[in-house]
């Protein structure tokens, strides 16, 4: 009888029971088994008599099906039994080895249905840990594919190769095919040929891992075939067949002995236990055995196919039916919903029969694709709507009553209207399930409308600034040129006052506070401040250009000359002057020159009346990279300062003064010439009068020889002095004499000599002062 | 015995044989069968004794397996036989109906292996066309899932529902389960319960189409169970069981009669033939039955899983191992190849065991993903390389010897070098299989390098134009202002000549032909022409601004005045004039005024010496939309013409002439005043001399009372006339008297009177001419 009841090595939850080691120890007691043990397992369809066979053959006590009740699964998991008693034809009472028998749960049970996971792992485990694997099959199963577990064996062979194919222990397994209910009509040789051929075919078709490509079935397995008679209808023969089978498990040395050394794992028993547990772990972790059921695999394949077809039909219908409706929200949405519903319905009709989770997963994916496709049209519609609403807004803003409605108000109203209509359209799409996420669209729309409003605002601002510029620039130019062409000492104070007031006047409509402006565009305080600053920059640039273009050397000389002549030619009341004496001319010259040069300094350096250099309060220069903006060189090689206040260089100042002096000297010369011609011109009738009045005196002189002699002597002396240019010494002598005796000479002589002397001194003094000024 | 041999209705290639109609006619001859016929088919695993049963039961002659040879498939396709002879327990020799029997190819044959396509279609067809479907199964198959064709039945039930579920003919099928080799240990009731429960479970799990959700198994099928004893080991009982089965096919009216009216299709025989053919077409076309084999489905699932894992591992390793190598082509490529090979090897090891085409397909997809991921790094590398090479090119271009190497040459050399290194790098990647298509990268690279060269070219061009501008603008300004400040009648000819020559001088380095320039940047002829045109536009704008800013009213008045004074104040030799008479002044005045006004016309309208208006040869104005560029309104409301040649308006011309006249009149007045003072001034010593010389005459007059009396009378008369302003009439009288007696008066008197008269006339004439000119 059996030693002990069988234990469950691996339960239905695929847990390895470590009590096996304890069981082994109970079975073998204190005996040293060493390597003298064997492991046998069984594999086959459910209720194919596996347990019955093992019990009859090895006197084990595995549960078997009670056929009188019904056909159903009995063995669950993998059970382990120990035996030393094998049913044989003759009783051999010698030292029998310990045999450990694994009864494996039957494959293809209707209880597990499509879930083949445990079957594969159990079969794999049986092959891995056994020396002999009994493959149990009904005679009638031979020739079937699924029914004879050939598909299962193929998978098991493949995984076995990848997991254990390269093992170094040259472990081989005996596959013992036991053919049940073999009635004998078909010879066993024919059946074994069929099975062998099938196995070899499977092996050829296997996907073998690297290094096992050339391997053969027989590198890993030996095949044996045994037939057993019908247990119920041929009971005696069945018993006899089983005993004959039993002989091959105990008859060492004989040809048919099954436990050949090459099948043994060569592990001590406790080593085998660890090995078995390790095998189960590896098998459990192997993902190649983690396959979805046939149902799920088919469902994935079919739902994918159906989904693609439905989408294809949707797309083919889409364009032609949507094209004419692109502008109409109502008909567009209804058509979109219709097309989408049709597509999903078509999918549902065909795909709903497949596994629900797979069907729903693919439906979600299809829904996403449909929405993605639809979103293109929705985006187009929303963009068209946006364009239309935007045109409305632009028209409304441009045609508003500018007196009663501000730009900001009309833009805000238009924006509000756009947002309302846009959101309504989007809600329509969303309510109908055509739009999933509207955050992205809303965000893009908001960015778009902000961008467009910014453009509109920029255009309005540009127009306003353009108008300001169009007035400000010429006005500034005119005012500055007018002030500079008639300058005073405080011309720059005037220019600055006018500069500020001109700016103020041109943007007075936008002033909110002192130095705070709102350009009525809806900009922030800082943006308005920046625009104000830009306007000031423009104004300063205009001032700079105007000043530096106007105040050239020629212009400044002209200004100085005008100023000089105003004072020199006209008296305080504005009447033209008539010169009587040179002293008048010299005095007027000095005053006029001083009056002109008063403004020369302000025309060459822009300073206020407090002698403070004028510096722009905003940056004017465009930053030219790598260039010093303080100094630049013109095309004549002259270096200039770019500072606003610096109008003339020292060299240019010299140039101006030279030209000015030259011109006013000419004026003075003209004036002095007018005196000379006034002074020495004696009308012709005077000579007549003198002749008439002096006739009697003249006659008296002629009659008197003394007078004649004196006249001749004086004439001759006069002639000689003049001829030989001796007036200088004569003048000196006369002057000396005059200096000594002038107090006694009459007013006439003194007056005559002094007047001539003043003219000469004036000329010399002018030359001398000119040299003196140059030296300074 | 059997009437005729069976025919093949549907062959192994799934072709429907239309000879069936002919066969029917042969079987029934000229008899009118009407609806008195029945159709039976059989379904079950291969070699399960289906054909044997049909032959025994209906005396047909279907081929059966010869068990003594080997177990293998015999029936291929679907065969049709006709019988009227049913094997029954008692011989009933009455009018038997015609029975058409379909022998269907067995399912799960190892010959077809995993290909279940025909099995499904055959089973579906059998259900569709039969009244009774015999489901043949071994007793031992009960409890198995695949082994008992339950999976197959499930698929068939599903497709049957979708294809024929909504048929209006209320067609029902009797499923007659014949359990073979029923040894009787398990009661038939138990077996039928097991099968029924299994079928009901399958039906519940079915995915039913719309409209069939609430349907029951029994809406479409009736179930019957029959057990047959072991044919070989219980031969007599088997025969008896078959006869009992046969009774149920012929015993009308009995409870167990199988051919109930609700199973009949109610079609005449030829109608049934068309129906059968139509059914087969529908079944053939149904895609739900077109499933890949389990092998392929598993392969798809597993290779996807393996591929994703391999890719995941590749990506996790990728970043940290690539990051330090991004700059080195050699080590980068070797590491990329290594990582890619590792990934593909890992995939190959696990996935190569699965169906080859699926494995290769997924491998290609994985390869594409790997390359896509790698291409990111390659793009980064190539972009970095591009940046580095580009910096080299920029350095080389900027530091070239500008005397010996042109911009175009150095750019071309640099570009060639970049392309060479870039292509070498790309070839390296391509040769190692890391890059599939390099057209896109090459195209993007070419676009990039063209864009960068364009930027470099633009910068170089901008620099060149900047230098041209920096010289051209001030030079033009100076020249124009110089010419305009000292204008001649042909000033505009001079300005135009100088304008063209200044432009020419500044771009002479780039001239190729007359009016053709190459700016040595590598631009096309049209691009060079455009740049030349832009330079001319700039020059014209400068000319326009300079002219219109300079030629203001004040400046033109100043120019005219200078020109007047040059002629009026200085004689032909350049000496200052000293006026002797008013006639001289008037003559000089006329000449000088005419000389000044010569240039007034050219200063207000820019025309050449041929009196042709100067029009710019390039468009200067920036097009301000919606604005007429011919006329603009300044800030004083005055309308201006924007045409270049129009310098002064009519109003401004009047203004200039007024100011000019006022100024030159002052000058003339000064000059005339200088004459007056010259004419009438008598030095004081003359009076002394006159007194001295005329003392004796004076005394003589005093002593003579007549002279005294005359003197008093003349003095009194003189006083009265002066007091009452009667010089006019006195002058008239004197003139009249002189006119009558002047021939007798001495030169002195005539000279005195005439000179005084000329001065007065000069004054009156000036006023009169002034009024006259104003009226003109
Ligand atoms: N026809 C037949 N039935 C058998 C044979 N061996 C066992 N059975 C019966 O088949 C049923 C199932 O046997 P069992 O050993 O539990 O099958 P297991 O599920 O493969 O272990 C039991 O009712 C046995 O009596 C046999 O060789 N031939
Ligand atoms: N054990 C057994 N064998 C049978 C039975 N009926 C037929 N066979 C044998 O099974 C083999 C196959 O029979 P066949 O009718 O060709 O099977 P089919 O492929 O289903 O048509 C033949 O050798 C028959 O002799 C039966 O009821 N029991
Ligand atoms: Mg069992
Ligand atoms: Mg057959």
Swiss-Prot record, chains A, B:
InterPro entries in the record: G_GB1_RHD3_dom, P-loop_NTPase, RHD3/Sey1, Sey1/RHD3-like_3HB
UniProt-recorded Gene Ontology molecular function terms: GTP binding; GTPase activity
Quaternary organization: Interacts with RTN1 and YOP1; GTP binding is not required for these interactions.
EC number annotated for this UniProt entry: 3.6.5.-
Species assigned in the record: Saccharomyces cerevisiae (strain ATCC 204508 / S288c)
UniProtKB keywords: Endoplasmic reticulum, GTP-binding, Hydrolase, Membrane, Nucleotide-binding, Stress response, Transmembrane, Transmembrane helix
Induction data: By salt stress.
Record protein name field: Protein SEY1
